[in-house]
Amino acid sequence: MLVLVLGDLHIPHRCNSLPAKFKKLLVPGKIQHILCTGNLCTKESYDYLKTLAGDVHIVRGDFDENLNYPEQKVVTVGQFKIGLIHGHQVIPWGDMASLALLQRQFDVDILISGHTHKFEAFEHENKFYINPGSATGAYNALEANIIPSFVLMDIQASTVVTYVYQLIGDDVKVERIEYKKS
């Protein structure tokens, strides 16, 4: 089961669109679920995601026009409970102790957060944490040179194989990370 994880697009305010090389990789009909950390900013970005997969889950980012997106969400995909937040609620941004507290409050196997615009994935106390970064490479409050990135999770039974796609220069680099639920 394939799950696309992305966020912080900031279209059209900070970027015009997803990188063309990412659009070529994101083929309709291949992905079953989309988990988005927010800051899509417009309905057009949401409509584009709906063309990729029927099951789209979005939480509200601090720049989203749609105030109907929830602040947080917990979804179950296969054997995994997955928590989804934008990440502006985590202080300081990306702080491990704050993320671990949210993971325990949500009682999830995987916690997905964004807001920092920087990819990160790691295991902590037998739980998995993912920040997909910014799919467009949009700048953030602290940094202008952001590497565009998104994550594709392949969920099979009690294992998640995470593929991280990063646009470095003109090349899409892919890294593989495996997490087994204990």
From Swiss-Prot:
Main location: cytoplasm
Bilayer topology term: Peripheral membrane protein
Positions of post-translational N6-acetyllysine modification: 50
GO biological process terms held by the UniProt record: endocytic recycling; protein transport; retrograde transport, endosome to Golgi
GO MF assignments: metal ion binding
Pfam families (alphabetical): Metallophos_2
Location relative to the cell: Cytoplasm; Membrane; Endosome membrane; Early endosome
Entry keyword set: Acetylation, Cytoplasm, Endosome, Membrane, Metal-binding, Protein transport, Transport, Zinc
GO CC terms of this entry: cytosol; early endosome; endosome membrane; late endosome; retromer complex
CDD domains named in the record: MPP_Vps29
General function of this protein: Component of the commander complex that is essential for endosomal recycling of transmembrane cargos; the commander complex is composed of the CCC subcomplex and the retriever subcomplex. Component of the retriever complex, which is a heterotrimeric complex related to retromer cargo-selective complex (CSC) and essential for retromer-independent retrieval and recycling of numerous cargos such as integrin alpha-5/beta-1 (ITGA5:ITGB1). Component of the retromer cargo-selective complex (CSC).
Similarity section: Belongs to the VPS29 family.
NCBIfam families per UniProt: yfcE
Assembly notes: Component of the commander complex consisting of the CCC subcomplex and the retriever subcomplex. Component of the heterotrimeric retriever complex formed by VPS26C, VPS29 and VPS35L; within the complex interacts with VPS35L. Component of the heterotrimeric retromer cargo-selective complex (CSC), also described as vacuolar protein sorting subcomplex (VPS), formed by VPS26 (VPS26A or VPS26B), VPS29 and VPS35. The CSC has a highly elongated structure with VPS26 and VPS29 binding independently at opposite distal ends of VPS35 as central platform.
Family matches, as PANTHER family: VACUOLAR SORTING PROTEIN VPS29
UniProt-recorded name of the protein: Vacuolar protein sorting-associated protein 29
Primary gene name: VPS29
